[in-house]
Amino acid sequence: MRLVGHSPLSVRVENRVPGGDVNPYLAVAAMIAAGLAGIEAELPLEPAFEGNAYLDEGPRVPSTLRSALAAWQDSELARKAFGSDVVDHYANGARVELAAFDAAVTDWELQRGFERL
């Protein structure tokens, strides 16, 4: 999350983590749940960041569906915020998507296979 804008009238909160295929209601609910959990646990805020965040060595969100699925399934916060039925439902959807992806033969694999013959 970051504040962006050049004047008090144009300042807004931005979260560029969710993908374009996210359910916006679930994304906002997750952000609120995470914020409330941080407040309840009295977690300290990180210092304000300046510079290019893409070059920062700070914590990262999962970069693959497989690693995101593992984090989602193991998240006590997600289960508390959404309930186990919702977590399990979306986890199953991710597993189905991963199975379809794993079964696909890509152009790279075909090309590489022909190179090796």
Model-derived regions, located:
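Catalytic-core signal marking the mid-to-C-terminal active-site face
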Residues: M1-L117
